[in-house]
Amino acid sequence: MTDIYNIKINSLQNKAIDLSEYKNKYILFVNVASKCGFTSQYKELEELYKMHKDNLMIIGSPCNQFGSQEPGTSEDIEAFCKVNFGVTFLMTEKIDVKGSKQHALYKWLTDKTLNNSKSSSVKWNFQKYLVSPEGQLVDYYFSITKPSSSKITKHLI
């Protein structure tokens, strides 16, 4: 099993993110897009983050692979998220979450041989992956699952 905390990824501002800073917290990874029917989930993600920020980090990863619904630059994405939803949780650089250029983070999240839990494929924007404070994949949730769903929040209590 590969350690998720060793995976390298940059923020939307092109600064290195050290995932090990979030050891001992749950991390909810979400592939996000600004022009999707599920984009309104940004609001619930922000509310969830504010409610549980002592034991939860949310990390959004912009992705343009589903319906070209995240065409903007890093600056566009950051402005959209702040102005429309007041997003304060962590956002990564735009990445691929599937296919031949799949980012190492999403390789780990979707491959049982790496995460030692489950294999999956990212089906659409706003699919969610919950990682435990010990760095284990807890579960994944399709786009239709709201951030406030008890399927997710039961782990945070």
Predicted regions and their residues:
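N-terminal "domain-start" segment that seeds a small globular fold
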Residues: 1-20, 40, 104
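Amphipathic alpha-helical repeat scaffolds
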Residues: 11, 31-35
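Conserved helix-turn-beta segment immediately C-terminal to the redox Cys motif
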Residues: 24-26, 35, 39-64, 81-85
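Thiol-based oxidoreductase modules, predominantly thioredoxin-like and allied folds used
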Residues: 31, 55-73, 88-99
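Short, internal strand/loop/helix patches
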Residues: 75-123
